[in-house]
Amino acid sequence: MKKIMEYLQHYINQYPHRLALVFEDRHLTYGELSKEIYQASMRYKEVKLNKKVGLMDEHPVNNIINYFAVHQRGGIPCIFNHQWSNERIYQLVKSYDIQWLIKDNHLTSNHDNSIYNDEVIPRNVIHIGFTSGTTGLPKAFYRNEHSWIVSFKENEKLLQHCEETIVAPGPLSHSLSLYACIYALSTGKTFIGQKNFNPLSLMRLINQLNKATAIFVVPTMVQQLISTQRHCSSIKSILSSGAKLTLQQFQQIRNLYPQANLIEFFGTSEASFISYNFNQSSPANSVGKLFPHVETRLLNQDDDAVGLLAVRSEMVFSGYVGQSNQEGAWIKTGDFAYIKNQHLFLVGRESDRIIVGGINVYPTAIESLIMDIEGIDEALVIGIPHAKFGEIAILLYSGKVQLNYRQIKFF
């Protein structure tokens, strides 16, 4: 039995009447969740050990129930986005040999001649996730149980208010929301989610429960929460993963939620958590302090010690489906970075680098500086061909101020 199943069963036995899942239209206690999982597992008796099962129900509660039910059958849940087209689902099923699909509590077989008959499944896999690229077919990857258990422990160290409720309003097909949900249920907490992100409705749910709360969000959600101007004293920790928040956003959060700690994470679906910034205590341009036991390498460093970031830790994934995976391998993030005093500084994506007269220019670094100018709403740096320099960088911005070349150069 997987450890997450053991953890869940412990809290089912200890606190059967405690709320486990809260969505706008569905609330389940730990006891009720247990019954739902058992009933679902009885419907899926055909699922065998290590067989892949696509979860594609429109309601996230059903997908959570089915996630654990598939585990009870020894299968591997595959986390689909219910908004994917039928064509995309068909391509994923064929490409990654997903033998079963579950939708509306119905198990459908997709058995066919598999290109992965001889595939070696990594140890202790808890699910298959998919990268969220905007083009092409999402890449399937294995998430192992140990990596998340280690991550849970690191999270517990950062929560300082004995939080009883974990909130993640994003779709469960996104690693952050699924992680937060399994984290909550593995530690006996209440999980609040949403079918579609609605900040006002979310505030009402949190206020109704009135428990110390940690909320896992991405920066666009942070901005929408700020826009509501709704104070919520129950929110004790805000954990943001994605783009670095601006100083202005941080100050707005402090004004709206003065009792809350803001913890910014840098990481990827593959590498999990790499660094964290607690209440913006790290240097201004960094993405935080490296987590303990995260090893780093900077490949192909230039004269400024900037190189391509690769990481290794107990929190990383177990590789892509269908590719040979080596335990303990280094994970390349695709970011140019440097490290100073255990703090990580990102200067740009490998694919975005502009070379101006032989000098590396990193648009992300420039955009970050421009966004710190008061009155700037958005900033974008692009490269265009140039006869003399090969490329030059062009800044596009919007806001209430007008910038000039000398001002930017001085800044």
From Swiss-Prot:
GO terms for molecular function: medium-chain fatty acid-CoA ligase activity. It holds the Pfam family AMP-binding. The keyword Transmembrane helix does not apply. Keywords: Fatty acid metabolism, Ligase, Lipid metabolism. It comes from the Bacteria. Its EC number is 6.2.1.-. GO terms for biological process: fatty acid metabolic process. InterPro entries: AMP-bd_C_sf, AMP-binding_CS, AMP-dep_synth/lig_dom, ANL_N_sf. Belongs to the ATP-dependent AMP-binding enzyme family. This is Putative long chain fatty acid-CoA ligase VraA. It comes from Staphylococcus epidermidis (strain ATCC 12228 / FDA PCI 1200). The gene is vraA.
